[in-house]
Design a protein with these regions (language model features):
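Ribonuclease/tRNase effector modules and their secretory precursors
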Residues: 1-93
Length: 93
């Protein structure tokens, strides 16, 4: 995983860190989880967004992102909800 595979808005990253206590630098590591699951984000948006749930250390994170060419643009990152934890567990057993 290379740093140039990811991009984000620095102001949004700072807000996300304050609100969810998850940095985008940490969040990008979830993409390296070979058992990570991704799905289309069905929230209404003017762009196609994806959700990825992956393990970073012992913390399960959910990242909202979009693909821009060969790069992933991180939009938000947070600890996975109970439903997302269950889905991750079921997909990986």
């Amino acid at each position: 995983m290379r740093d140039d595979e990811f991009e984000w808005d620095d102001r949004k990253a700072a807000r996300n860190l304050r609100h969810h206590a998850v940095s985008f630098e940490l969040a990008r590591l979830a993409f390296a989880d070979p058992r990570a699951i991704d799905r289309l984000d069905l929230d209404e948006s003017d762009e196609d967004r994806m959700l990825l749930t992956g393990l970073v250390g012992d913390v399960l994170l959910t990242i909202c992102f979009t693909e821009r060419g060969s790069r992933k643009r991180i939009i938000s990152a947070r600890r996975a909800s109970q439903r997302e934890k269950t889905e991750y567990s079921e997909q990986n057993t």
